[in-house]
């Protein structure tokens, strides 16, 4: 009977460790295959009525580069207000994914579908990305 409880304890410990590793291990939000399908990006910033559509492949690569790296953790750190949406479209105009960036008490949070992600560490690249899009859309271009 002692052996049974030892095995149960080991299985429970392994399950707890698996859940912990699932949330701590850095992941990417987009795969290379998904990136290859993206033909255009539409960006919308909260509080700005204009939407920006980008079709230049080099600019799309620059914008999506951070999302292709293992620099995010799963989970929702805090609540927050929607700051920006990045909609990814294929050549036929079908929406492939919606990435929502939320400013959560100074912490960046991203949502794709029903999954939440946040950067492994502070990343000024996302703040700069948001700022540049907001300035571009407020200028009307």
Role assignments for model-derived ranges:
Residues 2-141:
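Function-determining sites in protein domains
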